[in-house]
Each structure stands twice: as structure tokens, then as C-alpha cells.
Regions:
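Conserved alpha-helix/loop element of class I SAM-dependent methyltransferases that forms part
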Residues: 2-19
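Short beta-strand element of Class I
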Residues: 43-49
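S-adenosyl-L-methionine
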Residues: 49-88
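Active-site capping/gating segments
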Residues: 125-164
């Protein structure tokens, strides 16, 4: 699923990338958030994780199409994979979680430095509550929630957590 432009731009704004050097995009799907981040911040190192094999080709195609090479696409189950070979993120966007949101947040919270940001777009009450619970239980503070209705249907809650 492609993250719609208003949602993507607000998510990137909440990630506060201007003084950061490494961003992770977990569950990147088509890579729209990674590509937009790289376009806005060309020096930003972007590491994008996706479970589905087809994601790699989508990321390559989209990064080439929009002229932003240098995004590292990693294919595999984020929760299960070792992450020590990747640069430590200062900002993380969760685009997809495959029903394992709490496990993802736990793993990310262990890696984020103090002041690091985590942004999640919730399309359901259940996923919003799950994110809030995961944040509270893993040393993160929910700093901001923005409800965005890009159209008349399907409002999206964009949640920002920060590691203290």
C-alpha cells in the first residue's frame, strides 16, 4: 500500500529528520516513505525493511524512478533478524507490522538512542491502542498524536514516540 502524500509528509515531519543521519523504514511496502525521506534529506542514510520479497524490486524501481539512490532495502522478518550490521537509527517509521507491532516496538526501543523518534500510522483503534501500550512498556514517551483525514473516509492517526 502506498502511503498517501499528506500522510507521508506529516509522518516525515514528525520524524524530525533535519538533524538526523540514520532513518529506518520498517515494513516499507512500496518504499514511498523511504523515497520521500531521501528526496528531502539526500545525506540521510535510509535502511528499509520489508518482509515480502517483492518489496526489493518495488524499492529499486521507485528509488530509480524518483532519482534517489542509496536506500538500503533489507528483505526478511524484522522481528526475527539480527540488526547489529545496520547503522543505529535516530528515527524509525513503522509502515507495516504484520500483527507484530508490540514486538517491533520492543526491538526498536532497545536500539533507539535517547531523543530518537518513532512514528507509526494507525488505521484502526486496535493498532493505535497496541502502539500506545507498546510505547508505554518500552521506555518511550508518546509525544504527539495527529488525526488526519485525507478524504472523508478512513482517518489515520499518526503517532510520534520519543525515547527519553
Amino acid at each position: 500500500m502506498i502511503t498517501k502524500m499528506p500522510v507521508r509528509l506529516l509522518s516525515l515531519s514528525l520524524l524530525d529528520l533535519r538533524d538526523k543521519s540514520v532513518m529506518w523504514d520498517v515494513g516499507f511496502c512500496t518504499g514511498s516513505v523511504s523515497v520521500e525521506a531521501k528526496l528531502q534529506f539526500p545525506r540521510l542514510e535510509v535502511v528499509a525493511f520489508e518482509k515480502r520479497e517483492a518489496g526489493k524490486l518495488l524499492m529499486e524501481t521507485n528509488s530509480r524512478r524518483f532519482g534517489c539512490p542509496g536506500i538500503t532495502a533489507v528483505i526478511g522478518d524484522f522481528v526475527e533478524m539480527p540488526l547489529e550490521n545496520y547503522p543505529v537509527p535516530e528515527a524509525v517509521f513503522i509502515g507495516g507490522h504484520g500483527g507484530r507491532l508490540k514486538e517491533m516496538v520492543r526491538k526498536i526501543a532497545l536500539l533507539l538512542p535517547a531523543g530518537g523518534t518513532l512514528v507509526f500510522n494507525s488505521v484502526s483503534e486496535d493498532s493505535r491502542v497496541s502502539f500506545e501500550e507498546a510505547v508505554a512498556g518500552n521506555g518511550l514517551v508518546l509525544e504527539q498524536t495527529v488525526r488526519l483525514a485525507a478524504d472523508r473516509h478512513n482517518p489515520i492517526d499518526i503517532l510520534k514516540a520519543v525515547k527519553r
